[in-house]
Design a protein with these regions (language model features):
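Conserved strand-to-helix beginnings and helix N-cap segments that scaffold or border functional pockets
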Residues: 60-64, 284, 314-316
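Lipolytic serine-hydrolase domain surface
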Residues: 2-27, 87-145, 149-154, 169, ...
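Gly/Ala-rich beta-loop-alpha elbow adjacent to hydrolase catalytic centers
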Residues: 273-275, 279, 283
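Short beta-strand element of the alpha/beta-hydrolase
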Residues: 44-52
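Short substrate-entry loop that stabilizes the transition state in hydrolases
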Residues: 54-60
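Proline/glycine-enriched tight loop/beta-turn segments at coil->beta junctions
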Residues: 37-45
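Conserved alpha/beta-hydrolase
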Residues: 75-89
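Short amphipathic alpha-helix adjacent to the substrate-entry channel of hydrolases
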Residues: 62-78
């Protein structure tokens, strides 16, 4: 296979449903790319990029177009390989969105949120312990009445009954947020939404602020987790496909082998890995696969944008494989932005879920709630092992100023196409 001059430095490897090759032509193009890069007159800079998983193939191609135009257009020595997650989570969920289970999810959440409006109409109070106790009793009474109404409604099915039962068994923080200090303000979006203004800790004499939409998010997470609905199985399948791709002779393992053969011919070649969201797990799998070969594992730059990796698994890969890198960079959203994301997950949960995909992964899609995710600021602010901090030369949370540059990034999904993020990343690739 002979690649066109414009495509010779940049190729896209598409994955099949099983993590293998979508088409043998992709494998042939990879081998042609390898031959081209190995014969370069100057030591090449090989960049392997993996996009996030919640996109269609068309959107994936569009993202890679932007990466090539903004990140690599002015760097002729960069030779770029992109993983194109051909059958992404987007398509999987789109196919499932009309299924009975998915309809149940939307119905359960909207029914409970709508009914909760009655419980939200508590009178304002001055925050004194005596008044708080009265409000608590009223809230519990309203919740029990709500439970009875839900059970008797003709439109209520068994799943909604179970969700209502779950309401009466909430852990203390959620009880405080959703019942002890239920706000009067009720905000309506596409689905009825209860806005929780604040909560009161039992050991505190004054109100302690709670996150906006805290109860909305908690309810969706509990329904998804409890009933193992399509998003859970889809997320597990996406991760399985990532790891399957790095089993020989599949695409991930083939790319690792190609890069190592190029470095044998071009010992001064540089290698950098970039991953966004699910792409962070691709980077981790690449490092693990390369480590198993026993060859030189030096990497120039590892850049993770809002990565969905387990914090523990990324630590393990680095510890076991002994990877050496010049710089590791992590950029993610501030926790305040993660908690205020509306409509990010369509068609996953549409307007029902008011937070980012990483919050849903951590609280509902992984095996245990509050599962530590590498790209979430909240887990870096909590006590974390020192070796986690030592893995990265720079950790940045946006929106904010990074290396003197203003970066206005407000959504989980837009990192790979944000000109400010890409300009910052380009400068770091050059400086390394």
């Amino acid at each position: 296979v002979t690649l066109s001059p414009t495509a010779s430095n940049n190729i896209r490897v598409r994955l099949g449903d099983d993590g293998g090759w979508h088409d043998r032509r992709d494998h042939n193009e990879l081998l042609a790319w390898e031959s081209h890069v190995a014969q370069a007159s100057e030591p090449p800079h090989i960049v392997v990029y993996a996009h996030g998983g919640l996109v269609s193939e068309a959107v994936g191609n569009s993202i890679i177009d932007t990466i090539e135009q903004r990140l690599f257009a002015n760097a002729p020595n960069i030779c770029h390989v992109s993983f194109l997650n051909r059958t992404g989570l987007f398509e999987t969920l789109d196919q499932l969105s009309n299924s009975r289970a998915f309809t149940w999810l939307a119905r359960a959440v909207t029914s409970v949120l709508s009914a909760l409006q009655d419980a939200s109409a508590l009178p304002e109070h001055d925050g004194s312990p005596e008044v708080r106790e009265d409000a608590s009793q009223v809230a519990v009474k309203r919740a029990r009445e709500l439970h009875g109404r839900l059970q008797s409604r003709s439109l209520t099915d068994s799943i909604v009954d179970e969700v209502a039962n779950k309401l009466l068994q909430l852990p203390e923080p959620q009880v405080a947020a959703a019942l002890l200090e239920v706000a009067r303000a009720v905000q309506r979006r596409a689905a009825a939404r209860v806005v929780v203004k604040g909560r009161v800790r039992r050991d505190s004499a004054s109100p302690v602020p709670a996150s906006r939409n805290e109860f909305d998010a908690y309810l969706v997470e509990e329904v998804v987790r409890r009933f193992q609905l399509p998003p859970v199985s889809a997320w597990r399948e996406m991760k399985r496909r990532v790891h399957a791709a790095f089993a020989p002779p599949h695409p991930g393992a083939a790319i690792v082998a190609s890069v190592q053969r190029v470095r044998h011919i071009q010992p001064d070649a540089r290698v950098s890995l970039i991953g966004h969201s699910l792409g962070g797990i691709w980077v981790e799998a690449y490092l693990a696969c390369a480590g198993e070969t026993g060859n030189d594992l030096h990497v120039d730059t590892v850049a993770l944008l809002a990565p969905a990796n387990s914090l523990a698994s990324f630590r393990r890969v680095h510890r076991w494989q002994g990877t050496v890198w010049t710089q590791a960079l992590l950029m993610g959203l501030t926790d305040a932005e993660e908690r205020e994301e509306i409509d990010e997950l369509s068609p996953l949960l549409g307007t029902l879920y008011p937070r980012t995909l990483l919050y849903l992964i951590s609280n509902a899609l992984e095996d245990q709630p509050a599962f530590p995710i590498l790209g979430m600021q909240k887990f870096w602010e909590a006590p974390v092992p020192h070796d986690v901090h030592d893995l990265f030369q720079q950790v940045s949370w946006v929106p904010g100023i990074v290396d003197g540059q203003v970066i206005e990034q407000y959504s989980h999904g837009g990192f790979s196409t944000n000109p400010q993020v890409l300009a910052w990343l380009a400068s770091r690739l050059v400086d390394s």
